[in-house]
Amino acid sequence: MLEVEGAEEKGIKVVKVEGEERLCTRNLVDGVQVYGEQLIKIDGVEYRVWDPFRSKLAAAIIKGLKHLPISVSSKVLYLGASTGTTVSHVSDIAYKGVVYAVESAPRVARELIERVAKHRRNVIPIVEDARRYEHYPAMAGKVDVIYCDIAQQDQTDIAIANAKAYLKDKGYLMLIVKTRSIDVTKEPKSIVEEEVAKLRSNGFSIEKVIYLEPFDKDHAMVIARYKS
């Protein structure tokens, strides 16, 4: 299940819970849950169970993601933060870094702030449409990783525009391709191939494509490196 390089340093672990192997991250804020997840103590260290049916990043790890570009000190721009389920686990991993969490819906952003940002020193919420990236509050320099999980037909174009503005050279884009948001009439695999071609033509090299079934139907994660 767990093949992530540097998993121990990043606080990613597989733990047996009631006889079943479950993916976990070391909790940055002891005793605080984000989405009702189970908290487990191991040798005095608290971990949070990471549900792959609620987090596409967890699904990708279980489906064999080895090179997770997010390090303990990464600066991450997270597009489509929603209420902060995956954001919180990224915050656990990048505990010495920062997560700029972009969410466009004010009501959802309020939940993100209450559930996550209020408790976690390394999460900075940005209430803005990811298309209006030039309106983000000033960020301290460029980011190491952009994680994009937005259900829009032009999701890849939005990710590319944000990368051109904020991603370091040789930085990584982790793009969730939601094929049914792009075109319901085409085969999901052909849509993923089209989005990958779009990334290549904009200066990205593709490291990995992971299809997320059975956790998320018709979704894939693309790991791409910028101007490498």
Task: Write out the residue ranges for each language-model feature.
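Conserved class I S-adenosyl-L-methionine
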Residues: 70-82, 100
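Short glycine-centered segments of the SAM/dcSAM-binding site in methyltransferase folds
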Residues: 75, 98, 170-172
